[in-house]
Structures are given as structure tokens and as C-alpha cells.
Amino acid sequence: MKFLKRGVALALLAAFALTTQPAQAYEKDKTYKITILHTNDHHGHFWRSEYGEYGLAAQKTLVDSIRKEVAQEGGSVLLLSGGDINTGGPESDLQDAEPDFRGMNLIGYDAMAVGNHEFDNPLTVLRQQEKWAKFPFLSANIYQKSTGERLFKPWAIFTRQDIKIAVIGLTTDDTAKIGNPEYFTDIEFRKPAEEAKVVIQELNMNEKPDVIIATTHMGHYDNGDHGSNAPGDVEMARSLPAGSLAMIVGGHSQDPVCMASENKKQVNYVPGTPCAPRSEE
């Protein structure tokens, strides 16, 4: 599918072998098949381009096909977005991305991380987009300065095959310096890794999920070499206690992260071909 050339990563979490926590709804020593589909950096491309690329109609065709295939194998699907729905196509920008969010509803997105480009518009526009969307906008590290309260839900809970899955949202703290400063007078972007530690602790104490994953808009930088950018997914994964997160599905840097072998990234990846995700021990 040509629209896969921009921002679509399919991360398959084929099975959870959950055997460590007692008194849960799942059966001990049973393998559960849960497929996690993830897209990021959509940037207003709800419409198919003149080159046959992009378009939410094509994306729905693909997602529906995968859902059917997974269901036939007895599995379940969770569909996440790494954010940056906004900014890129005038047909979207001039409508405040309403077609994009309504299209994502039809595809069946479960949750979305808030991206930096969501703040290319005033907060009032973002709140309207939340009303259009039938899925939660997640970010644990964006706060309102005047109240000290988070602006968005930090997490969402989903149940797939009796498995309780917590999804945390996180946003790059670079947003404040790369966005329009007039929109941030009462908004604070805290360090995502530090907020992740707090949220994971809160989840384990209060919600007791079987699995915790993060959908982020922070960027992936090889070996954590983020340069002048704020730290991304790799640095956060290394800063957290082992086993804190089962998976990170991210966006922002828009680089495919496909592994040829352990600790060896695949070079010259061709969109649409198989992509083995990275494992950070």
C-alpha cells in the first residue's frame, strides 16, 4: 500500500505469556495473542494524494483486513496513534483537522498520544478536536501552570482477551521551544521520563494492569544520541526500571525502527515490507 510511505508503523505484539501475577482474569501459562497497530505523524493526510499515497480510506482498508485476520486466529487488536495529526495538508489545516479525526473514528482508533503539532493551534481548537474524536488524547507530562493539573488524561485502560492493558501517553518536552510560544503561556511540558515513573507507580498501585505500554511523541534516536533534541524513547526506556513497560510505540522523529538482528538496525528499509521492532533490555 503506497500510503505506508509516511508515518505508519505496524508493531505486532504477538503474544503475552502472563504467568507472574496471581489472581488475575487470565489463565496461567496460556498464550494470548494481542496485535497492536500503531500509526504516527499523520499530518493532515486524510485524503489520497495525486501520487496514490496516504489517505484514511486506504488505511481503513488495511486495518480492517488485519482485524479480520487477527480475529480468525483468535486474537484481539489495539489501535494507537503517536500523534501529530495536525499540520501538513491545507485541506486538513483549513478545517482544523476535523476530517482526520472523524476518519480516525471510522477506522476505530483506541487512543492517541498528543504530539507537538497539536499545539500549532490554540488550546480551544485542540479541545474541539477532542470532542470530534471518539478516543482519548493522552499525555501524562503536559500541565496547566496556573492549576498544576494535567491538561490530558495520563493513561487509558483497555481489556483484550481478559488482559488489562494500560496505555500511557507522553509528549516531547521540546514542544515548548518548537511551537508557537503564545499558546504556551499557561502550559508546562515536564520531563516525560520522570512523569512516566510517577504514572507507572500510580498504575501499579491503583489500577493493577497486567501490561503497561506507552504511546509517545518523543522521537527515536539511535543509541540515545538525541543531539540538540530532547531525550526520546530510547533514553526513557533505559532510565526506567527493567520491566516497567512492555512496549513503547512512538512518533515524532518519523524514522522506521526495524531491526536486522539484535542491536543491529536494518538499513534502507522499504516501506510495506516486514519490520521487526526493537527490543530494549
Predicted regions and their residues:
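Short, high-confidence coil segments that cap the C-terminus of an alpha-helix
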Residues: 74-76, 109, 208-209
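Short catalytic helix/loop segments, enriched in acidic residues and glycine
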Residues: 51-65, 105, 188-196
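Domain-core and long-helix interface of multi-subunit machines
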Residues: 193-239, 243, 258-261
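Well-ordered alpha-helical segments embedded in enzymatic catalytic cores
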Residues: 58-62, 99, 125, 195-199, ...
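Gram-negative bacterial Sec-dependent N-terminal signal peptides
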Residues: 2-22
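Generic enzyme active-site microenvironment
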Residues: 39, 82, 215
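Signal peptide-proximal N-terminal region
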Residues: 59-77, 204
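Active-site-adjacent helix-turn-beta-strand microarchitecture at beta-sheet edges
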Residues: 26-47, 78, 86-190, 228-280
